[in-house]
């Protein structure tokens, strides 16, 4: 994701990469009126009550379980994106960058120890929406993950 531009618009990607886009479909995250593109190679995994209590609102994994994308909606007590960014750095996140995705301000970052790339948005309700994917070191999966992140938009 370090190759991510600071301003990303799905319409630009869609025009350049119709073949890739055709290999997935938009899913809606009901809790927060957000939709995002998810490749068909990643299937939704049923969440347990424990997952839901942990803030997970979606989990998508390849059939061989070698790659996954998690969608988390967590209460951060109204923390601003700037405050969240500072907390990320304090907790070992690297490559923390400000981005704008389809008009929404966000932060991208990397968790090296778990080979995970993440994007986070704060919401008016005082929550943070995070989309995280692993393994980011897999070039093919990293490309798919960047598409997923670039597709996040309001409904």
Q: Over which residues does each language-model region extend?
A:
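A short acidic-to-branched-hydrophobic micro-motif
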Residues: 58-83, 128-132
